[in-house]
């Protein structure tokens, strides 16, 4: 799966056409009030670009929440239509469904670049292809899924996908359009450009920074990156499993991953074979409980962490070591914080790592932050705009870094 040769919205002739854009408007709601409109704002450049090129109609489609394949007013996209209208400075017509004769009629009778927002795609079981009933997964009928995809295709002449956050899902709106031209929107294209920079053609030295609780959750990630990078910083909870297995360090009540422990020797062996430097913490900030009010202490690899205490952050020497490792790199992919940054007392390791990453980017390095917790870090402590790229897709970026193909990306047309 090449990331760098996909058709972009800029390659399309949209004049007079029905342009279907799969966006990610999965915004947080409090009742019918949007509490954070960032995802809507992020889609504006693609929508505006298409509008500037005289389409017949722009049809926008998204999911919101997890309605489990049935209509649930709580997850309606209706509030998004009003917000989008005020951001675009243009009327947005909201339809009460995403497929069917009424929707087709509204789309086909639109003109002069009208903007239509469809109702939540996931109100139909055929979008995700299954639903949960009494703890069981029930698959959608194959013929019904094919029909749903045909109904979506009937609304469009060209297809644009700007929903990177859902690119790892083979959902109908991501892979179901029987159209010649299936292009990436600006958001999607930016994600692909940056991940291609790292995974297909990195400027070296290439560093991966990995955090998170369990080695077993990140095994595919570590294994894939060991074939690509020059060094890896292992931080967060999973560092304790590494140091206990490798050096028999006492880790007290810190996280230990039994299943992951069995995998550590193989990963270390592969790192040696590939000449990849593994950088582990050498000291820790400890706590007497997993709490923001915990009593804080310090421990080193030499002293070990006594029983009754747990490591919740990287200590001062580890911060220096991590900063020095970051300073040497020219390309960095960061997925997972080095400590429990949600608690102020245990956020210093994460803040110091972010500062080092920002400095690297300002000195010309490429610093890519995977979605999820690490994107939250960049937002919380300020710095998202100073890094090269903060991904909008937690699950999607993780699967890319694990070396998996993303259905929504594979499905995009190649550049001619």
From Swiss-Prot:
GO molecular function: ADP binding; ATP binding; metal ion binding; phosphoglycerate kinase activity
EC number of this enzyme: 2.7.2.3
Subcellular location(s) per record: Cytoplasm; Mitochondrion
Pathway linked to the protein: Carbohydrate degradation; glycolysis; pyruvate from D-glyceraldehyde 3-phosphate: step 2/5
InterPro entries linked: Phosphoglycerate_kinase, Phosphoglycerate_kinase_CS, Phosphoglycerate_kinase_N, Phosphoglycerate_kinase_sf
Residues engaged in binding CDP: 212, 217, 236, 336, 341
Main location, first listed in the record: cytoplasm
Residues given in the record as (2R)-3-phosphoglycerate binding sites: 23-26, 38-39, 62-63, 65-66, 121-122, 168-169
Class of this enzyme: transferase
GO BP annotations listed: gluconeogenesis; glycolytic process
Residues bound to ADP: 212, 236, 341
Amino-acid positions noted as binding AMP in the UniProt annotation, renumbered to this chain: 213-214, 218, 237, 311, 342
Domain of life of the source: Eukaryota
Binding positions for ATP per the UniProt entry: 213, 218, 237, 311, 342, 373-374
Xref: PROSITE patterns: PGLYCERATE_KINASE (PS00111)
Cofactor(s) required, per the database record: Mg(2+)
Annotated Mg(2+) binding sites: 213, 217, 373
Recorded catalytic activity of this chain's protein: (2R)-3-phosphoglycerate + ATP = (2R)-3-phospho-glyceroyl phosphate + ADP
Any one of the GO CC terms: mitochondrion
Record's function text: Catalyzes one of the two ATP producing reactions in the glycolytic pathway via the reversible conversion of 1,3-diphosphoglycerate to 3-phosphoglycerate. Both L- and D- forms of purine and pyrimidine nucleotides can be used as substrates, but the activity is much lower on pyrimidines. Negatively regulates the biosynthesis of acetyl-CoA from pyruvate in the mitochondrion.
Similarity-based family: Belongs to the phosphoglycerate kinase family.
HAMAP family given in the database record: Phosphoglyc_kinase
Assembly and binders: Monomer.
Name recorded for this polypeptide: Phosphoglycerate kinase
Protein source organism: Komagataella pastoris (Yeast)
Gene that specifies this protein: PGK1
């Amino acid at each position: 799966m090449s990331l760098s040769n996909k058709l972009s919205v800029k390659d399309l002739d949209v004049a007079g056409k029905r342009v279907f854009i799969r966006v990610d408007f999965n915004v947080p709601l409090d009742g019918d009030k949007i509490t954070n409109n960032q995802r809507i704002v992020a889609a504006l450049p693609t929508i505006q670009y298409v509008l500037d090129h005289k389409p017949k109609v722009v049809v926008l489609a998204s999911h919101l929440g997890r309605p489990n394949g049935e209509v649930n007013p709580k997850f309606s996209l209706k509030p998004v239509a009003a917000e989008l209208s005020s951001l675009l400075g243009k009327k947005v017509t909201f339809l009460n469904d995403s497929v069917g004769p009424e929707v087709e009629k509204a789309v086909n009778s639109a003109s002069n670049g009208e903007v239509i927002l469809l109702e939540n795609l996931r109100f139909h079981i055929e979008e995700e292809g299954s639903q949960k009933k009494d703890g069981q997964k029930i698959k959608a009928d194959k013929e019904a899924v094919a029909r749903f995809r045909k109904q979506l295709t009937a609304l469009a002449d060209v297809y644009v996908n700007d929903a990177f956050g859902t690119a790892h899902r083979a959902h109908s709106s991501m892979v179901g359009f029987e159209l010649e031209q299936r292009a990436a929107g600006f958001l999607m294209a930016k994600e692909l450009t940056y991940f291609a920079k790292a995974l297909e053609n990195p400027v070296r030295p290439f560093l991966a920074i990995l955090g998170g609780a369990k080695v077993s959750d990140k095994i595919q990630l570590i294994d894939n990156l060991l074939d690509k990078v020059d060094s890896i910083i292992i931080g967060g909870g999973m560092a304790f499993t590494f140091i206990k297995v490798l050096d028999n360090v006492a880790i007290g009540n810190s996280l230990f991953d039994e299943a992951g422990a069995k995998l550590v020797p193989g990963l270390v062996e592969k790192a040696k074979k590939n000449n990849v430097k593994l950088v582990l913490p050498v000291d820790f900030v400890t706590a007497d409980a997993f709490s923001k009010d915990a009593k804080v202490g310090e421990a080193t690899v030499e002293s070990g962490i006594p029983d009754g205490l747990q490591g919740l952050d990287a200590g001062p020497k580890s911060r220096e070591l991590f900063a020095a490792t970051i300073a040497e790199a020219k390309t960095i992919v960061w997925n997972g914080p080095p400590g429990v940054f949600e608690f102020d007392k245990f956020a210093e390791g994460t803040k110091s790592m972010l500062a080092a990453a920002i400095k690297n980017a300002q000195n010309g390095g490429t610093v890519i932050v995977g979605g999820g917790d690490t994107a939250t870090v960049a937002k919380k402590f300020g710095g998202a705009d100073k890094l090269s790229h903060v991904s909008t897709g937690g699950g999607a970026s993780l699967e890319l870094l694990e070396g998996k193909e993303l259905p929504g990306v594979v499905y995009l047309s190649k550049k001619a």
